[in-house]
Amino acid sequence: MAVMSAGHAVADALARLGVRQVFGMAGSCMLEILDGMHGREDIYFLSVRHEQAAALMADAWGRITGRPGVCMATNGPGATNLVTGVANAWQAQSPVLVITGAPMMRDTFRDSAQEID
């Protein structure tokens, strides 16, 4: 059995679910997933300049296509910057999947950099 990284497994799962693009702003906690998407033709990452734009684009994608729009952000402020777009999607009942990072388990609940409880 071939060994697969968690990031490649996430990219494969998203592609199998019919996700063709992921909107987001690259951050260190997402590098494994971005690596899993790199070079693939069935799914790609569309980089934005602000996480709120990624959430709004995922919302628009969900409304237009009826298929889940996916947005990704790094932990801490990256995740909180998604809130307006995600709230907008929730209000409109559009299908949106949000993937965010988190601190390493050893740093959880220790007020580590960019931790949100």
Language-model region placement:
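N-terminal alpha/beta PP-like core and its mobile active-site loop of ThDP/TPP-dependent enzymes
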Residues: M1-D117
